[in-house]
């Protein structure tokens, strides 16, 4: 049956262990987007994103409400384009995008981003919560 042929091939690929596995977990996951770390201090929310080999001109940071999006592109090295045939590669090239929901509102005017040694660091000042008092009439 067609389904059996598909599942047998698929299962063989999944359980093919070793260096040539098509489902090498660490290589597969790394292509989804760069790893990041989110920290929260009393006054700030800080995000570090691992983007080695990507120039700041190829990175973009957007804030839409409580959603922070980091996007960019890792270009293929020039020597690979005209070089020998690559038989195996776990390097990820191309566009990526990561969106996270911030745990608290931030002041969109007080955001700082810097790139140093392949780490994109984003520091955002938390908004001061505005507390109001209101007496609610019971109906």
From Swiss-Prot:
GO terms for cellular component: mitochondrion. Belongs to the small heat shock protein (HSP20) family. Residues 27-139 form the sHSP domain. CDD domains: ACD_sHsps-like. It comes from Schizosaccharomyces pombe (strain 972 / ATCC 24843). It is found in: Mitochondrion. It comes from the Eukaryota. One of its GO terms (molecular function) is protein folding chaperone. Keywords: Mitochondrion, Stress response. This is Heat shock protein homolog C338.06c. Pfam families: HSP20. Disulfide bonds: none annotated. GO terms for biological process: chaperone-mediated protein folding.
